[in-house]
């Protein structure tokens, strides 16, 4: 049996439910699949099945995460749902499943809670482009004014973290009522689910395709081919490369070298173009083997620059996850794995009032590398010490 081909007739978006524990994230995910299953656009996935999220490893960190697929009339969605709070933090920081849009679930019975805030902060730090609010469990609150109050609080919270809290869409309903509803898509219990899906289709922006972004390829290996020159190999992270394109070699120093890719090859075949996701070899004009090394990147001129100092949101592994057993302070110098670069860096600053960072913490810090690497906001990295992963981070701002 051949694998079913993924039909690209509709734009594809990655979305996810976020919010406080027991506010109904997983029930809402189940309700979406139930409603769409009436139209043959999803397989109904009940709560128990989503909740048994399989383990995945991303940058040496184990995360429990469920991937649910469904489509509306106009779009195809991959929806992620995590069973535990720590899984959400780890997922958002490692980028195991990046989100083009998030559905913030808030229970009308509770209003915004500590994890609601933490997820909103993380969504801001990792640049989730858009957010829709689903106020859940409205059937358990008799007074409409109390729900209005919850909506006001959520909008204020979103404003505080620089989301358009006054303008973004808010849908009210009961995910459980929909999950327990009859087999009739026109039953009123499904109205909020339909409203949510219509809102996702209209409000979540279509993501830019990886091939439309400026070319970037981390250098994995360098070979010298007698009579032909220097070939660098790697997996194209984004964009397109064609023979004759000019590229910059960036990283390891502030000195940026320009060269031209004279040939693009994959499995010893010459390509007209290499695309995001392809593992290729690029032949570089006029570059010696010792002028380029693993850890650098090839990139479209002017699209990325080398830096040493940046701010990052970091998740520090617990000892049960294979991380450190003890806290660390400013001045700690682990290895940073940034794309293919492996570089020593120092933690030079923590937030005010933070003296030390404990295993299991999620904290913003400033990092200074011993030499410059191609860095940009939103980029993910791993922190390792003595051959084991001790943390994962995402760049939130470039300092210098």
UniProtKB/Swiss-Prot annotation:
The protein's name: Elongation factor Tu
Gene transcribed to yield this protein: tuf
Top EC group: hydrolase
Gene3D superfamilies: P-loop containing nucleotide triphosphate hydrolases, Translation factors
Organism field: Thermosipho africanus (strain TCF52B)
InterPro entries xrefs: EF-Tu_GTP-bd, EF-Tu_GTPase, EFTu-like_2, EFTU_2, G_TR_CS, P-loop_NTPase, Small_GTP-bd, T_Tr_GTP-bd_dom
Matching CDD domains: EF_Tu, EFTU_II, EFTU_III
Catalysed transformations (reactions): GTP + H2O = GDP + phosphate + H(+)
Subunit structure: Monomer.
Zinc found in the keyword field: no
Family membership noted in the UniProt record: Belongs to the TRAFAC class translation factor GTPase superfamily. Classic translation factor GTPase family. EF-Tu/EF-1A subfamily.
Entry's EC annotation: 3.6.5.3
Region annotated G2, chain positions: 60-64
G1: annotated span: 19-26
PANTHER family referenced in this protein's UniProt entry, alphabetically: ELONGATION FACTOR TU, MITOCHONDRIAL, ELONGATION FACTOR TU-RELATED
Biological role: GTP hydrolase that promotes the GTP-dependent binding of aminoacyl-tRNA to the A-site of ribosomes during protein biosynthesis.
Binding residues annotated for Mg(2+), in chain numbering: 26
């Amino acid at each position: 049996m051949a694998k079913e081909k993924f039909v690209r007739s509709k734009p594809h978006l990655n979305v996810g439910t976020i919010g406080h524990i027991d506010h109904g994230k997983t029930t809402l995910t189940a309700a979406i699949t139930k409603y769409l299953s009436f139209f043959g656009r999803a397989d109904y996935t009940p709560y128990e099945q989503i909740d048994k999220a399989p383990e995945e490893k991303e940058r040496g960190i184990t995360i429990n995460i469920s991937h649910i697929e469904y489509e509306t009339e106009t779009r195809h969605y991959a929806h992620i749902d995590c069973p535990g709070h720590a899984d959400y933090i780890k997922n958002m920081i490692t980028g195991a499943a990046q989100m083009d849009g998030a559905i913030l679930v808030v229970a009308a019975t509770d209003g915004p809670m500590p994890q609601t805030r933490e997820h909103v902060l993380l969504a801001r730090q990792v640049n989730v482009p858009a957010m829709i609010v689903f106020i859940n469990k409205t059937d358990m609150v008799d007074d409409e004014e109390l729900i209005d109050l919850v909506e006001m609080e959520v909008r204020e919270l979103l404003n505080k973290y620089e989301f358009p809290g006054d303008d973004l869409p808010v849908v009210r309903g009961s995910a459980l009522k929909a999950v327990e509803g009859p087999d009739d898509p026109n039953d009123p219990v499904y109205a909020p689910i339909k409203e949510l899906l219509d809102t996702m289709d209209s409000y979540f922006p279509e993501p830019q395709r990886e091939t439309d972004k400026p070319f970037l390829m981390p250098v994995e290996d360098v070979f010298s081919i007698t009579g032909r020159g220097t070939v660098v190999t790697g997996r194209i992270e984004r964009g397109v490369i064609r023979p004759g394109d000019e590229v910059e070699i960036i990283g390891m120093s502030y000195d940026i070298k320009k060269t031209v890719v004279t040939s693009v090859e994959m499995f010893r075949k010459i390509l007209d173009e290499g695309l995001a996701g392809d593992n290729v070899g690029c032949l570089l004009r006029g570059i010696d083997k010792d002028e380029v090394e693993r850890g650098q990147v090839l990139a479209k001129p002017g699209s990325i620059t080398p830096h040493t100092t940046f701010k990052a949101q970091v998740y520090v592994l617990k000892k049960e996850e294979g991380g450190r057993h003890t806290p660390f302070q400013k001045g700690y110098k682990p290895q940073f794995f940034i794309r293919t670069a492996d570089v020593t860096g120092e933690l030079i600053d923590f937030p005010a009032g933070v003296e030390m960072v404990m295993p299991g913490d999620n904290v913003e810090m400033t990092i200074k590398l011993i030499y410059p690497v191609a860095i940009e906001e939103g980029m993910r990295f791993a922190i390792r010490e003595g051959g084991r992963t001790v943390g994962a981070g995402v760049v939130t701002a470039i300092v210098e």
